[in-house]
Curated annotation (Swiss-Prot):
SUPFAM superfamilies: Glutathione synthetase ATP-binding domain-like, PreATP-grasp domain. It comes from Mycobacterium leprae (strain TN). InterPro entries: ATP-grasp, ATP_grasp_subdomain_1, D-Ala_lig_Van_CS, D_ala_D_ala, Dala_Dala_lig_C, Dala_Dala_lig_N, PreATP-grasp_dom_sf. One of its GO terms (biological process) is cell wall organization. It is found in: Cytoplasm. One of its GO terms (molecular function) is metal ion binding. It catalyses: 2 D-alanine + ATP = D-alanyl-D-alanine + ADP + phosphate + H(+). The gene is ddl. This is D-alanine--D-alanine ligase. Belongs to the D-alanine--D-alanine ligase family. Pathway: Cell wall biogenesis; peptidoglycan biosynthesis. Binds 2 magnesium or manganese ions per subunit. Keywords: ATP-binding, Cell shape, Cell wall biogenesis/degradation, Cytoplasm, Ligase, Magnesium, Manganese, Metal-binding, Nucleotide-binding, Peptidoglycan synthesis. ATP binds at residues 195-250.
Length: 384
């Protein structure tokens, strides 16, 4: 008679600490950025307080229980990290609330039976950027499964992901915005009146994307068709925004376990060495592969400007009914701050602004992450 033995999985935690599943990767074109963020979070979660489980999602959507080694989720020789089916053990998270928090094996062989509960978790940290993660999809799954999770709920995640509806909610609250036009899938280009209203230059973006993927700066209308086609490689809905001449500022927002909300110091992004180039902007390569971005934290702005930015950041957070955390991006113009966008799950990579903003606000990285987890547990799940 063969006796079943669980395969050796040394990364599975034990003990009485809060068990956190860091979920990363995913089907969006921000897969690699999510992996980088997860590596940074895995490195900085306080292991005295938390047991940590790493769950990677492949680009095809397969969930894998992986080794929570942050070194495996780093850029190596300019190669971005990714989750593969060889990364660990295939699993699922059941939506049945009677099995809340269970990670269930889907694998066969090597002594492992499909349907076996690999481990159970107390809270999920969904470090997913872009569609199929940051847009309310995984938040809906976790609500069905009654598993607490870090970050915004279904509505705020969906609204924050879609630039059109973010802007509509901000406009309803009277927040300062730039001019824009939305091109839905059946609209090939702008009307003449829209071109006149926006004027050049404009930025053409996927409406539901991040990390500056798929974005083009258009300085002549002849460039518009190719810019729209490029954006539509990532999203059939495209947004065209009037360029704003101003400094790029960012501010972090953090919800505490008691429900109060705080804003961080203000930071500024400058693209090094290309300040005289009209076509330069803070794109994906600048953010993650090249050392071309300079981050001033805190930003060199007057106190009254910083206070206004922090106040607007909290207003933006509340305008979409956000929870947990967010980063709000601004342009500082001669007439004051203009909101660019809100990120309901900002980047946590080694170069990301969000943890840097809180570090200069006297909240170190482990404390920042612990606050997010504590807030998720205090909030729970369900209508609130």
């Amino acid at each position: 008679m063969n006796v079943y033995q669980r395969p050796l999985m040394p990364w599975l935690p034990s003990g009485g600490r809060v068990r956190v599943a860091v979920v990363f990767g995913g089907r969006s074109n921000e897969h690699a950025v999510s992996c980088l963020s997860a590596g940074s979070i895995l490195r900085n979660l306080d292991r005295q307080r938390f047991d940590v489980v790493a769950v990677g999602i492949t680009p095809e959507g397969t969930w894998m229980l992986t080794d929570p080694n942050p070194d495996a989720l780093a850029i190596a020789n300019r190669q971005l990290p990714a989750v593969s089916c060889e990364s660990g053990i295939e699993l699922t998270l059941p939506a049945d609330p009677r099995r809340s928090g269970q990670l269930v094996s889907l694998s066969h062989g090597a002594g492992l039976g499909a349907g076996e509960v690999l481990t159970s978790v107390d809270v999920v940290f969904p470090v997913l950027h872009g569609p199929y993660g940051e847009d309310g999809t995984i938040q809906g799954l976790l609500e069905l499964a009654r598993v607490p999770y870090v970050g915004a709920g279904v509505l705020a995640s969906a609204a924050g992901m879609d630039k059109e509806f973010t802007k509509k909610l901000f406009a309803a609250e009277g927040l300062p915005l730039s001019a824009y036009t939305v091109l839905r899938p059946l609209r090939p280009t702008l009307h003449r009146q829209e071109c006149e209203r926006l004027s050049l230059p404009v930025f053409v973006k996927p409406a539901r994307g991040g990390s500056s993927i798929g974005i083009s700066r258009v300085s002549s209308w002849g460039q518009l068709p190719s810019a729209i086609a490029y954006a539509r490689r990532h999203d059939p809905k495209v947004i065209v925004e009037a360029a704003v001449n101003g400094r790029e500022l960012e501010c972090g927002v953090l919800e505490m376990p008691d429900g109060t909300v705080a804003a961080s110091a203000v930071g500024e992004i400058r693209v090094a060495g290309v300040s005289g180039s009209e076509d330069s902007f803070y794109d994906f390569t600048t953010k993650y592969l090249d050392d071309a971005a300079e981050l001033d934290v805190p930003a060199k702005v007057d106190d009254d400007v910083a206070d206004e930015v922090r106040q607007l950041a909290i207003q933006a957070f509340r305008a979409i009914d956000c929870q947990g955390l967010a980063r709000v991006d601004f342009f500082l113009t001669d007439d004051g701050p203009v909101i660019n966008e809100i990120n309901t799950m900002p980047g946590f990579t080694m170069t990301s602004m969000y943890p840097k903003l809180w570090a200069v606000s006297s909240v170190d990285y482990p404390t920042l992450l612990a606050t997010m987890v504590d807030t998720a547990l205090a909030r729970g799940v369900g209508m609130r």
